[in-house]
Amino acid sequence: MKSIKKALALLIVLTMVFAFAAPVAHAKARTTKIGVGLYQDSGAAVSAVKAYLANLEDTLNVKFTYTVLSNTDEAQNITKVQELIAAGCDGIIITMDMGTEAILQECADAGVYCAGYLCDFDSSFRTNYDNVFKNELFLGTVADGGCADEARRGYDFFDSVIEYNERTPDAPIRHVAMTVFPAFAFPYQQSFAAQFVEKVEEYNAANPDKAIEVDPLSDETDILMFRPMDSTYFSKHPGIDAIVSICSGSFVYPTMVSAGVSNTMKLFAAGYNDGDEAVFGSKGAYQMEIVSPVEAITYPLVLLLNKINGAQFPDQPAEAERRGSSVLIINSDEDLAKFQHSIYLSFKPEDAFLTPEDVVALTAYNNPDATYAGLVEILDHMTIDDIK
């Protein structure tokens, strides 16, 4: 993080120098309005995103307005984008690849730019590339961690289980089961489950005396249709020590509590929910959580602001890109202590990886030395170890 902070500090200084040396096109005289279509309307991540963006408003002369998109209803997403356009938004950030081509047509009719966040737009990338990624109104997207062709989420879960076993050699995990969301909404979660199994099999071959048993995914109990896990899960998977929930732990932990196993069984999960810290690590069932840094939204935001203000980077790609970002992986009490000083948990702007001045320095319309490569680089420096 020190290297990125030094680079940003230099960009800030250069921005100030150019500001005094010659007229620079700073933010528009009128306030730029950006619409943000999130995947839900509440929760820690939503609160953190809003806290981060609210802290940027005065410095960037931007106003943010919010709506909620659907991962199953294309018509709803189109309607929500129409509402953002009608509200006067100059640019829109969306978190769902559902109805994207139609959304871009709405943007074209209104002269509004669009970019993505927390989504790799894999469906559009694979089946509709020309109409989305080559569309001049779509500026690119930053994924939730890695993009589909580079994601290693299953390996992250494996690493966390092994780290737990090394930390607690007297009570290691020897038998696990998994949960995922349905493939129609999250097509790569079963691939992540396969990654996890692959690593376990490699580990077992090298460490037969420490072998870990993994139950195969059951269509009956393990694919959670966006509702809490059924209590029959435990009869389907008798004798397990832990659950690897590649989908959100919030769909699993309440069932563990009601079944009376939350004090004896461990949970490795994606996502973070309010209050999880009270039952994390040495305090309870949760032993791992993975969250995306909310500051990654800086990538689509800067791309939008550059376009709206008539600027672009000298190294701007000819076509929109999808980029992965680092993630916050919380594996221990020590990691949790760091996480409590992130904006994701504190909602305090001063705990963000980037200040408003950092973001200004990343924009081409404020800083002639800003580059696309510099914007992409910040996405790699938002891990648990970067929290100081």
Task: List the predicted regions and their residue ranges.
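Sec-dependent signal peptide cleavage junction
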Residues: 18-30
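Extracytoplasmic "Venus flytrap"
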Residues: 31-60, 65-79, 95-98, 181-191
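Hydrophobic alpha-helical
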Residues: 53, 78, 82, 91-114, ...
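Short beta-strand elements in bilobed, periplasmic/extracellular small-molecule ligand-binding domains
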Residues: 59-71, 178, 201-224
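Acidic/His-rich segments in extracytoplasmic proteins that coordinate ligands and/or metal ions
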Residues: 65-163, 175
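Hydrophobic alpha-helical segments within soluble ligand-binding/sensing domains
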Residues: 131-177, 226-227, 271-277, 293-309
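Flexible loop/turn connectors
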Residues: 262-334
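Hinge/cleft segment of the Venus flytrap/periplasmic-binding protein
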Residues: 303-388
